[in-house]
Amino acid sequence: AMRFLEDVLAEVMDIFPSEYIHIGGDECPKTRWEQCPKCQAKIKELGLKDDAHFTAENYLQSYVMTRMEKFVEDHGRKVIGWDEVLEGGLGPKVTVMSWRSVDGGREGAKQHHDVIMTPCSHLYFDYYQTDNTDDEPIAIGGYIPVSRVYEFEPIPSELTEEEAKHILGAQANLWVEYIKDMNTAFYRVLPRMD
């Protein structure tokens, strides 16, 4: 599995010359890993254990992510991962994309990681922008009016000045599995992105 991941990342890096490579790390079904004999064997081999903070499966994901981080960095690139990469620990140079809430971004900044804020509560443009959805194009759900987007402050007020320097900015997302055409995409994005 690790060789496969490295091969995929090598090909991605060959195609895309960007400074950063996003390696994901979100929505990883750790409940499956609890039942997976190969995963449990690897957990045992690595001596990973549940503790007060995380499960052995969280630490297994951290092991995989840390290996991929090293692989990417060995190729002269920097790693970005979704905020789940904080669960179980991560390398010091990983940039965290905080999507589930601002909490992951806050925690990442407190741990001195660079952070891109992209919380689904404010910046997921595949959500409805009106609460009257009867005549709206189908959306994945949620409701984010323009006012909520515009009120979003990417730097949490409780961060120290030094921690706040790690907030690189914000990013809005438009996931397209429910977007039928470009007109719908533009409708979802504007005026929220304006």
Protein language model regions, located:
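Flexible, acidic glycine-rich loops studded with aromatic residues
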Residues: 78-94, 98-194
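Substrate-binding cleft of carbohydrate-active enzyme catalytic domains
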Residues: 1-77
